[in-house]
UniProtKB/Swiss-Prot annotation:
Its EC number is 3.5.1.5. The active site is at H320 (proton donor). GO terms for biological process: urea catabolic process. This is Urease subunit alpha. The modification N6-carboxylysine is found at K217. Pathway: Nitrogen metabolism; urea degradation; CO(2) and NH(3) from urea (urease route): step 1/1. It is found in: Cytoplasm. One of its GO terms (molecular function) is nickel cation binding. GO terms for cellular component: cytoplasm. InterPro entries: Amidohydro-rel, Metal-dep_hydrolase_composite, Metal_Hydrolase, Urease_alpha_N_dom, Urease_alpha_subunit, Urease_AS, Urease_asu, Urease_asu_c. Keywords: Cytoplasm, Hydrolase, Metal-binding, Nickel. The lineage of its organism: Bacteria, Pseudomonadati, Pseudomonadota, Gammaproteobacteria, Alteromonadales. It is an enzyme of class 3 (hydrolase).
Amino acid sequence: MAKISRQAYADMFGPTVGDRVRLADTALMLEVEQDLTTYGEEVKFGGGKVIRDGMGQSQALSKDCVDAVITNALILDHWGIVKADIGIKHGRIVGIGKAGNPDVQPNVDIVIGAGTEAIAGEGKIITAGAIDTHVHFICPQQVEEALCAGTTTFIGGGTGPVAGSTATTVTPGIWNMHRMLEAADELPINVGLFGKGTVSNPDAIREQIANGAMGLKIHEDWGATPAAIDTCMTVADEMDVQVAIHSDTLNEGGFYEATTKAIGDRVIHVFHTEGAGGGHAPDVIKSVGEPNIIPASTNPTMPYTINTVDEHLDMLMVCHHLDPAIAEDVAFAESRIRRETIAAEDILHDLGAISVMSSDSQAMGRVAEVAMRTWQCAHKMKLQRGPLEGDSELSDNTRLKRYVAKYTINPAITHGISHEVGSIEKGKLADIVLWDPAFFGVKPALVLKGGLAVYAPMGDINGAIPTPQPVHYRPMYAATGKARAATSMTFLPKAAIEAGITEKLKLTHLIGEVKGCRNIRKKDMIHNSYTPVIELDSQTYVVKADGMALVCEPLAELPMAQRYFLF
């Protein structure tokens, strides 16, 4: 039997079982757990390669073969770290296994034919597109920035650069909801909009859901009182949508205990659980210990560095329409920024106690840094806490699965869309990000939206080949023409779909139904369901989880940072 060295094999077909890959310039190491391809029968496209007529390409008609195949992909997902070919048909993932020509090759479960496009996955790491659940729709240009960083789903609210939207992720009322759904229909990204949940009249909430709100947002800037919380939660249970909350920093309507009493045993998604982004000061972080609360972070506090605290005060003043000349406004801002809880946040992520990562785009967060900040935190925690149980210095698979779940499958489960997006699994929309390992988490090599290229780095358009400088991200065909609608999805609640909102507004996006939001718990958060007893010293702000003090130092230098953005 002919043999090939492990290095030569990796160079040709990508790493296989037992091989390890460093992620960007971090201390994180990935180890391949399983290889679903067949040694000696690998498919690869190119001159003198396998995917040719009668060899790796069969005679199958389009109905019997995939529309695209990603060959020799190294998948990093919550369910595993696996080498496989990925088959895509009609914009969805239909196979994860061995691609090729079943007439001449064994073990083929993904058929390549004349109707199949080839996407080279050799040497690439594949992740699902990120789902950002805390998007302030302040400007449409956010979409380009996010797609170029691997985010393919926006959930949030807003109507543009106006005071209400720069502070709160809310698209309020029927008229605003309709206009934003129409605007989103032109965007090459999946979209779900929050209605205003801060109202004590249940009919004012019902009408927003019936007109397209896939979730509800309670925000202190509109008022986060116990009465409004109870009303919102009651209607959410009735109509099966999720509720997100930015609770009462000033403790005006009640303290933390009043909010949790109003919530009761009903599920809710708590934003920026650490507190710098807002919420009961200083103890909103206690919500990490509630079994019915799905806690999330926003990326400006992640991870804790020597600059984190200094940049937050100015950010907060701008985002919440505060006046630095008013002492009470300054005191409000300062009450939210605590070194101790920011430090604890990193450790809570590493323990799997905070389940979701998001951006808080242009409203104290950076829309293109969801994945990057997540992996920077994972790196920091490996340096400061060592390998997790089951990991080693040379393999961080447990940690990698935990962290990738925070911005893929867990936000999808939280908002009732995990049947459509959130992982590399059969049946789901083919929102897929390909990364060169050296640029993992920072700059994708290719972003697929519904199985078609949507953004990619591209060189001189008048060049003889695609690679000459200057290379920068450019929109591709899934961002163009009618393909935008055919490859992206708008998420709507059942009530809006039954009310005919799609037809009334003439929406052309694919439509995904939000469902199963109200019967979930924190225990359903994959790799991130730890629910410790949280104690907070109200004088020192030191946080304890199950009696363990959560203390760590800020980093002075991060990976995935300046060296990647020199040009």
